[in-house]
A protein has these predicted regions:
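Juxtamembrane and boundary regions of transmembrane helices in multi-pass small-molecule transporters
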Residues: 115-167
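Hydrophobic alpha-helical transmembrane segments of multi-pass integral membrane proteins
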Residues: 54-94
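Membrane-interface interhelical connector segments
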Residues: 41-60
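Core transmembrane alpha-helical segments of multi-pass membrane transporters/permeases
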Residues: 7-42
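Hydrophobic core segments of alpha-helical transmembrane domains in multi-pass membrane transport
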Residues: 1, 31, 66-74, 151-165
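Alpha-helical transmembrane segments of multi-pass membrane proteins
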Residues: 60-73, 99-120
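Helix-loop-helix module between adjacent transmembrane segments
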Residues: 31-38, 74, 78, 112-120, ...
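Transmembrane helix-loop junctions in multi-pass membrane proteins
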Residues: 2-9, 36-47, 75-81, 161-167
């Protein structure tokens, strides 16, 4: 298919990894950081903070708080898997699932709401910085600028779908 010999595989793999740099291992590091945050009790701290913002029993504000927090924390962490454990424990369970929402639907939509944040942050190097590096773009954030409006629309759609179908 490529008309290259198999001996080119190590050379080309090395070249691409060197071009991408340290961003290659960033997703794994961020995933590990998420588990450290979860073990440290960050979810409980977030739950206590959100308890003052989201009124008891308000499903809409619970859904909005959960989806937006997933996106924002994913932007900070750079990885939706890292944010998922912390935000679901801190907001998803007490403010959405405990109000009668379907946990499977909340989990699926919560995780993908986090991916809306992935599209809007340089911390998600594997999605945003690596493509800019490979394409040798002048502005390393160009990919993010293009993706941000779509990500915001998708986040709003996630909120609507979760509110309408999870309960």
């Amino acid at each position: 298919v490529t008309k290259e010999s198999p001996t080119m595989i190590p050379h080309e793999s090395s070249r691409i990894l060197q071009q991408m740099g340290a961003t290659v291992i960033l997703p794994q590091l961020l995933g590990a950081l998420g588990s450290v945050f979860a073990k440290a009790g960050v979810g409980e701290v977030i739950a206590s903070l959100m308890g003052g913002v989201i009124p008891d029993g308000n499903r809409l504000l619970g859904v909005i708080g959960y989806c937006v927090a997933m996106a924002v924390f994913t932007m900070i962490m750079g990885n939706a898997f890292a944010a998922f454990a912390v935000i679901t424990a801190g907001i998803g369970v007490p403010f959405v699932i405990n109000l009668g929402a379907n946990p499977a639907l909340v989990g699926a939509l919560g995780l993908t709401a986090g991916y809306c944040g992935t599209l809007m942050t340089p911390m998600a190097a594997n999605f945003n910085i690596v493509p800019a590096s490979i394409l040798e773009m002048e502005n390393k954030n160009s990919v993010i600028f293009v993706q941000a409006p779509i990500a915001i629309v998708m986040l709003i759609i996630h909120i609507i779908i979760m509110y309408l179908f999870a309960f």
